Amino acid sequence: MGGLQKKKYESGSATNYITRNKARKKLSLSLADFRRLCILKGIYPHEPKHKKKVNKGSTAARTYYLLKDIRFLLHEPIVGKFREYKIFVRKLRKAYGKAEWSAVERLKENKPGYKLDHIIKERYPTFIDALRDVDDALSMCFLFSTFARTGKCHVQTIQLCRRLSVEWMNYIISSRSLRKVFLSIKGIYYQAEVLGQTITWIVPYQFAHNHPTDVDYRVMATFTELYTTLLGFVNFRLYQTLNLVYPPKLDGQGEISLKAEFEEDYALESESYTEKLSALSASLARMVASVEEEEAELDHFPTEGEDQEKMEVREKMEQQQSKQKKLFEGLKFFLNREVPRESLAFVIRCFGGEVSWDKSLCIGSTYEATDETITHHIVDRPSMDKQYINRYYIQPQWVYDSVNAKIQLPVEEYFLGVTLPPHLSPFVEETEGDYVPPEKLKLMALQRGEKPQAEEDEEEEGEEEEDDEEDEEDDEQSEDEEEAEEEANLAEMEEKRSQGKSLSVKVTPGKAKAENRARAAEEEKAEEKRLAIMMMKKKEKYLYDKIMFGKKRKVREANKLAAKRKAHDDASKADKKKKKKKC
């Protein structure tokens, strides 16, 4: 007794998905508005497992969304605002066509708008969730803040992104949360630790750039609209945690120090305060004046399940972080006009240093180049005409490398005109079996407090090789004489044997050798491991072989890189010798 036969494509996966066109018609939105709505709400297309079933037997390429997501969008208030805006544009176009200017003004005053506050609260229920997703928001805001004021995007969006990015940088400076910096071809990567969350973002270089034509700026603008709202919420909450005034204001002392004689020459009166904030050279005002108190040393007790060693490691890391936060304390920097001012000022201020620049370069300079208390003058040119004796003249890379190394590196390798050492990425963490370049080994030795003698040893080896080459000719004659004597002795021994004269045989009493327990233990472990491998199941043996193959491949690659580096070093040494001989 069979029941009613089910019709095709009326149950299962065929009813769980909906095409983009059907979804758009269901919401009564244009394609552009539908795309905006999906970006704002975080709805994305899905790829069904059985396309043919979903598409009712057809194999045509289509975009599918989950039906429950589209039903969820039906109750979104922004959908109504999109429809209101569509009606507003239609009415405005009619008013322009009829030249009814009073109606145009009235319509512009009543232009429909919407807020994304409820969407932010919906997508990020807790503040930590928002912090975890703030990386892309920061990268997009920093990108838009560098755009020129062209027709590609609204001026208000550029100004908003600039304001939010300056607020973020000022917070990082006040909390001293920056941990790593890396200069790449794409831009400058920063990594900060905010409330226990690691946040990484990229900032483009301050170069004039042409807008590419193959980029959809409307999609980017929609993402920016969401990200600016998110970043505004995050900045407000972070400023509250540090008891800072929001929107940020300079404290009284900082405002006095940045008081320029001719501020109108730098910026308009309405923009001068924003420019002073973006200078990053003064501290921010607080709601309640902070009272400096001696930090009491608290007793640390291991938590449940945490042993003493882990607690000691954690304490050591905390000490390193507190030491890194004060890396540039007591140092005064002066930036020459050719160096990246904003990036260097941001990094130096994050670690407690003071920074200034020429008055004609930008608003916000706090002291002149003639100040005798300046300790480091950052220059990016081969030489300088006028130099002061009581300061170091270094290249900008010293600041970034010192931050990544968590110590003040020796300045000798960063003087003017000196070939800089390689800028190593702080985001690479070497594991067992990986290739570690000599520069990284030298840096690790400096971090341990050792003085690496790598360069001196190389120079000594070079000198020894030259001495050996000179002495080889002198030693050849003595070696020939020794070989001749050995051949004569062997000939005499052969003659004695042939004449029947046996050599004297001596028997020495044997001695009991002490057993090497460490070696015996290692052999026992190796035997146990071999037996364990033999007892493995087929599946486990396959996985084990794959793991060992991966480890061996990693070792081979590391050896290959080490051989390449050795060949490169040998070639550079040979070139140096040739140059010396020519001289």
UniProtKB/Swiss-Prot annotation:
GO terms for cellular component: nucleolus; nucleoplasm; PeBoW complex; preribosome, large subunit precursor. Residues 455-489 have a biased composition (Acidic residues). The lineage of its organism: Eukaryota, Metazoa, Chordata, Craniata, Vertebrata. InterPro entries: BRCT_dom, BRCT_dom_sf, PES. It comes from Danio rerio (Zebrafish). Disruption phenotype: Embryos exhibit smaller eyes, a reduced brain and visceral skeleton, shortened fins and a lack of expansion of liver and gut, and die on day 6 of development. This is Pescadillo. GO terms for molecular function: ribonucleoprotein complex binding; RNA binding. Residues 275-329 form a coiled coil. Component of the PeBoW complex, composed of bop1, pes1 and wdr12. The complex is held together by bop1, which interacts with pes1 via its N-terminal domain and with wdr12 via a high-affinity interaction between the seven-bladed beta-propeller domains of the 2 proteins. The PeBoW complex associates with the 66S pre-ribosome. It is found in: Nucleus, Nucleolus; Nucleus, Nucleoplasm. Keywords: Coiled coil, Nucleus, Ribosome biogenesis, rRNA processing. HAMAP family: Pescadillo (MF_03028). Residues 448-526, 558-583 are annotated as: Disordered.
